[in-house]
Amino acid sequence: MRNSIFSVAGRDMAIDLGTANTLVFVRGVGIVLNEPSVVAINTRDNRPLEVGMEAKRMIGRTPSYIQAIRPLRNGVIADFDITEKMLRYFIDKVHNRRLSARPRIVICVPSGITAVERRAVEEAAYHAGARRAYTIEEPMAAAIGVGLPVHEPSGSMVVDMGGGTTEVAVISLGGIVVSRSIRIGGDELDEAIISWVKKEYNMMLGERTAEQVKMAIGSAWPYRDEPAAEVRGRDLISGLPKTIVLSSSEVREAIEEPVQSIVDAVKFTLDKTPPELAADIMDRGIVLTGGGALLRGLDMRLASETGMPIVTADRPLQSVVLGSGACLEEFDVLGVVLSSSGRA
């Protein structure tokens, strides 16, 4: 059955190549893959051992000669070779090369990246087997993915908070009118929790533990009956395992600085928005997408600080890849929002 689905010649795909997760959308099928953007490498021969979920399970648990690497940092490629290997693995996983022509590939990129960084993404796609590579800015993809009328002469505003970046953009007539891209996302929140626990409790947390704490009891706004959680790490003084109880209010204090940076980016963008478009946004609301949209109370925090209505996307984790996929499904209409170096 899988072969029959992917054997159509030139089955095109859209890829949300995120710092935390990679999602793949195949034209005519939908989302077919959602895995962590992690590669486990044997440093003795530079050979990838595992990619995706299996590689993520290895983070912090590998012998010295095996490294679990996240090849993207802050939304851009930090390790080109490893990114290419990861892309090739994901493409091969969903695309039958023996029966299919090479696909056209659309890859999402942060709105604030340089031309060199954008070109690196395209090159990684070509090296991984693309016939033609396109890029689309993440806030535009997110807006399309949540069904905002991006081609109309009215303002729509999206806040897409991913693992490495937060993208804030006002869109009208198929273009980004005002945008702000900051290299702060879910990873920064995890790091803030690690730093805070280290400072307050003399305890070191692992990356995965910090992420689990954020998802379980993290919040950007106070609420009733706030929970607490047992957290295990390593005592920095004795070097022995240690367990503490963290409250939701403590985690909120830990992540306050990066959360405020996100709020400031939204306020900056609103301040630069033309009055007519600002009026449209007041009617329609600011749409939250990305994994950060799942942070409890972020909508309340933004509503309080901006005075604007806040709407959380129905499928915040999939919004960007769904919008990129829509560009393939309706290429004649939406293809104008894509960029390409033009390499054949």
Model region roles, listed by residue range:
Residues 1-161, 169-287, 293-344:
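Nucleotide/phosphate-binding catalytic cleft detector across ATP-hydrolyzing
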